[in-house]
């Protein structure tokens, strides 16, 4: 007859594997969060949210706060705008979108800064703090992406994209890679947030009741 491991020893083995797997997933989550922050910073800074096409009257492209539009008399692009130069941003919708995307970016960066709390606070609590921050970041990115097209009816955008351009109607222009990444980043932030919540609750239950030792009784 095969003798099984004592309940206490089996619980220790399960606990060791449980902790090891949780740490591996935690490292993966942290690495993905850092990579995601770089992605969000890039799409925030780059002015390639919408741009020209072969049918546009002029060449150019627009971002959240900066844009470049071709000169009628030459092929040179005239660039304007900056994150602190609100007067040069073409529309209120662009300003609002910039605010919410920036909010999402800083929340993601803030969740990375919270990694330092792992050394001084309860691990489960830190995961949950980061999860809420990443969920809020996803909300900010989503609002930014929804509001941004509301500014397509500005005079600067219409000058480049044509008179058919209006709110949520891009005319002859096309969506560029930064806007596409911003839309995809909403899902990324939600996945990271969900993963952080799972890790937080796993930390709360590192040793489930079913595996708690109930003495040295052998079966």
Curated annotation (Swiss-Prot):
* Cysteines engaged in disulfide bonds, as pairs: none
Q: Which GO terms describe its cellular component?
A: apical plasma membrane; plasma membrane; stereocilium tip
What keywords does the record list, in alphabetical order?
Answer: Cell membrane, Deafness, Disease variant, Ion transport, Membrane, Non-syndromic deafness, Transmembrane, Transmembrane helix, Transport
Q: Which regions span the lipid bilayer?
A: 25-45, 100-120, 129-149, 179-199
A single Gene Ontology biological process assigned to it is: monoatomic ion transport
User: Which compartments does it reside in?
Assistant: Cell membrane
Question: Which residues point to the Cytoplasmic side?
Answer: 1-24, 121-128, 200-219
Topological region Extracellular:
46-99, 150-178
Which topology term describes how it sits in the membrane? Multi-pass membrane protein
Quaternary form?
Answer: Forms the MET channel composed of TMC (TMC1 or TMC2), TMIE, TOMT, CIB (CIB2 or CIB3), LHPL5 and PCDH15. Interaction with PCDH15 is required for efficient localization to hair bundles.
The illness linked here is: Deafness, autosomal recessive, 67: A form of non-syndromic sensorineural hearing loss. Sensorineural deafness results from damage to the neural receptors of the inner ear, the nerve pathways to the brain, or the area of the brain that receives sound information.
Concerning its family, UniProt says:
Belongs to the LHFP family.
**Function, please?**
Auxiliary subunit of the mechanotransducer (MET) non-specific cation channel complex located at the tips of the shorter stereocilia of cochlear hair cells and that mediates sensory transduction in the auditory system. The MET complex is composed of two dimeric pore-forming ion-conducting transmembrane TMC (TMC1 or TMC2) subunits, and aided by several auxiliary proteins including LHFPL5, TMIE, CIB2/3 and TOMT, and the tip-link PCDH15. Functionally couples PCDH15 to the transduction channel.
Q: What is this protein called?
A: LHFPL tetraspan subfamily member 5 protein
- Organism encoding this protein: Homo sapiens (Human)
Q: Which gene encodes it?
A: LHFPL5
């Amino acid at each position: 007859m095969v003798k099984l491991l004592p309940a206490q020893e089996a619980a220790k083995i399960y606990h060791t594997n449980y902790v090891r797997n949780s740490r591996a997933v935690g490292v993966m989550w942290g690495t993905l969060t850092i990579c995601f922050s770089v992605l969000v910073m890039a799409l925030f800074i780059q002015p390639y949210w919408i741009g020209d096409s072969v049918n546009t009257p002029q060449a150019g492209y627009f971002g959240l706060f900066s844009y470049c539009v071709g000169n009628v008399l030459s092929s040179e692009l005239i660039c304007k705008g900056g994150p602190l130069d609100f007067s040069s941003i073409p529309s209120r919708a662009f300003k609002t979108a910039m605010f919410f995307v920036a909010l999402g970016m800083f929340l993601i960066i803030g969740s990375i800064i919270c990694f330092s709390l792992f050394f001084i606070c309860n691990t489960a609590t830190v995961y949950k703090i980061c999860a809420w921050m990443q969920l809020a970041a996803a909300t900010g990115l989503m609002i930014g992406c929804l509001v941004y097209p509301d500014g397509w009816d500005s005079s600067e955008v219409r000058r480049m994209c044509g008179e058919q351009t209006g709110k949520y109607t891009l005319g002859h222009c096309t969506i560029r890679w930064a806007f596409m990444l911003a839309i995809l980043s909403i899902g990324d932030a939600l996945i990271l947030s969900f993963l952080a919540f799972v890790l937080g609750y796993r930390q709360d239950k590192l040793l489930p009741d079913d595996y708690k030792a109930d003495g040295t009784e052998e079966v």
